[in-house]
């Protein structure tokens, strides 16, 4: 999972039995915590990062995407009125694919079984996944997300192992292509489907 720290951390927990020789990673930390590593998208000088979508996990790898929306100060910060705050957040998500607002960055972490440490494997700052929950194909070892580029909603894909091999498919600029924090799923026929502001969007397999 990712936490709510100012610079977000990716946090791993022992799922079942905690190793008998395991010690807390820091004073005051639960033994259940296996790792806690900053998500900085390759820039250790970053003073703030956000990653609010679900972490995508396959094998010993975990990928997070940036939700560091830009130029949203007028709509940020709670008013204390739930309806107004929800409307403001919705407005940010609606604009999250625009060039002035969209976040940039995808980062993969890998668990090293031998050293029992979580390490950054790769970073790609040329890809934007504004709000969709990404997915991964274990068969093809490809990462997918609903992205944005030049004001258009897109499908973005990267090599899960290296972060390279970038592929982009343009979908359109209309809100109907805005994933609005919905999940992305691969279909049995080689296509992709995701929820959007206006319903479900199906992308057939490329031939």
Question: Where in this protein do the model-derived segments appear?
Answer:
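Repeat-solenoid scaffold signature
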Residues: 2-13, 38-80
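Blade-level signature of beta-propeller repeat domains, shared across WD40, Kelch, NHL, RCC1
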Residues: 177-207
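Hydrophobic/aromatic beta-strand positions that recur at structurally equivalent sites within the blades
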Residues: 13-16, 109-111, 156-158, 202-206
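Repeated scaffold domains used in trafficking and secretory/extracellular systems
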Residues: 42-59, 126-136, 175-186
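Loop/turn-rich, solvent-exposed surfaces of beta-rich toroidal or solenoidal domains
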Residues: 60-174
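Blade-edge beta-strand/turn elements of extracellular beta-propeller
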Residues: 13-48, 109-127, 163-172
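Mobile, glycine-rich extracellular loop/lid and propeptide segments
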Residues: 1-16, 21-24, 187
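Structural signature of WD-repeat beta-propellers
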Residues: 26, 101, 150, 195-197
């Amino acid at each position: 999972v990712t936490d709510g720290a100012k610079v977000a951390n990716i946090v791993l927990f022992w799922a079942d039995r905690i190793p008998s020789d395991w010690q807390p990673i820091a004073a005051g930390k639960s033994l259940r915590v296996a790792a806690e590593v900053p998500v900085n998208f390759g820039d250790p000088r970053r003073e703030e990062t956000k990653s609010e979508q679900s972490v995508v996990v396959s094998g010993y790898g975990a990928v997070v995407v940036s939700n560091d929306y830009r130029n949203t100060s007028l709509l940020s910060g709670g008013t204390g009125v739930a309806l107004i705050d929800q409307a403001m957040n919705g407005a940010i998500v609606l604009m999250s694919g625009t060039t002035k607002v969209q976040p940039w960055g995808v980062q993969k972490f890998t668990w090293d079984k031998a050293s029992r440490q979580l390490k950054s494997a790769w970073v790609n700052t040329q890809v934007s996944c504004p709000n969709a929950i990404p997915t991964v194909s274990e068969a093809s070892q490809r990462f997918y997300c609903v992205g944005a580029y030049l004001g258009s909603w897109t499908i973005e894909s990267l090599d899960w192992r290296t972060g390279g091999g970038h592929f982009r498919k343009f979908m359109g600029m209309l809100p109907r292509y805005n994933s609005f924090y919905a999940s992305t799923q691969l279909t049995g026929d080689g296509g992709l489907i995701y929820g959007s502001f206006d319903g479900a969007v199906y992308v057939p397999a490329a031939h």
